[in-house]
Amino acid sequence: MSLSLWQQCLARLQDELPATEFSMWIRPLQAELSDNTLALYAPNRFVLDWVRDKYLNNINGLLNDFCGTEVPLLRFEVGSKPAARAHNNPVTASVSAPVAPVTRSAPMRPSWDNSPAQPELSYRSNVNPKHTFDNFVEGKSNQLARAAARQVADNPGGAYNPLFLYGGTGLGKTHLLHAVGNGIMARKANAKVVYMHSERFVQDMVKALQNNAIEEFKRYYRSVDALLIDDIQFFANKERSQEEFFHTFNALLEGNQQIILTSDRYPKEINGVEDRLKSRFGWGLTVAIEPPELETRVAILMKKADENDIRLPGEVAFFIAKRLRSNVRELEGALNRVIANANFTGRAITIDFVREALRDLLALQEKLVTIDNIQKTVAEYYKIKVADLLSKRRSRSVARPRQMAMALAKELTNHSLPEIGDAFGGRDHTTVLHACRKIEQLREESHDIKEDFSNLIRTLSS
């Protein structure tokens, strides 16, 4: 056997794991193979414990695949492998350079906006060059959305048209819109890409009507290469705007021009929007963005800290991520607060320091999400009684909500499995563990369970 064994394992793990997980937990490991023992060296105890807890089965399975009957013993250590200590050069995940900002001519207002008529339309891109695919942290919660957005950026008008992204506030929908815009313009510098909030479309239409320039308005919006509209739910109950957008939508699709829309809810759940529009929203691909799971939350914090040239210990990132779960914006806001406090006081960023810097935020979070609150919310959602969740009844109409509530308690609180089991009628920790695994499996297999979980997370985190 040679060290290429670990290289083979790395190649398979890179294929099997999300890119952020692989870069954060697996790539930093150094390997040494001798005397039928494969030693894996982690940069610190936190990474070692995490890898051993989360990926040991994956690694052992690969060793069995590659080695057959001559499987080496696996050993974990903290530090660098002996040969590397003299020239310590830790391996880190390579990050592609961000897309270079596209040179654009100075934006000019369309003629309905009270400026003199122009011989050619000038497009307000509004795309933020800072939001790219390279600095979007990928995880299970947003993997499909990012992949779809990437395909649209590479092949606008041809792949997934329209693309409809939906999910709660602060989960990365707007970032992906800008990333698509930047991706399209990186490939074609003169592409006519327009990003806007849905309210801006309404405002532009009102101005066009006031200035007797509705034909100019139509020509502008129907001649773009890509139209990216955020928060489409704000079209609700605006009948004239919906009418105009309906015709704009049809014109763009007929011209193979790309449309990307975002909303805080599934298209058919948007109240106050015409059925014919909601139907069209689903013509292409509709993708949910879920609240980030723990590993992704940790990766987001580490990446944000790195962008600010701040050394954030892994155990501190884990501490914050375990307690703030609702969205990316909340995570980044908390980290900014920690960094500011550290800069003002000159103190090192430790768990105790974070407890102090975020004490009001952490106290509020713990107060808002309790097992009692979860039980009441789940019972109301499934139209059963809290007493049913605590009972011994095993019918599916009760057992499934009970499993859902247990899984949410594990996700949203800091209680141990035995504590959660005790709160559900004195059940043991193995019952809770089975419930969590069952819901995780069903979220992969059942759209309804996935929607239920997302809706309940959104309700409990808001």
Swiss-Prot record:
Record bears the keyword Cytoplasm: yes
GO cellular component, one term: cytoplasm
Record region (Domain I, interacts with DnaA modulators): 1-83
One protein family per Pfam: Bac_DnaA_C
Compartments (UniProt record): Cytoplasm
PROSITE patterns, A to Z: DNAA
Keywords from the UniProt entry: ATP-binding, Cytoplasm, DNA replication, DNA-binding, Lipid-binding, Nucleotide-binding
Coiled coil spans: none
Biased composition (Polar residues): 112-125
Start and end residues of each stretch annotated as Domain IV, binds dsDNA: 343-462
Name recorded for this polypeptide: Chromosomal replication initiator protein DnaA
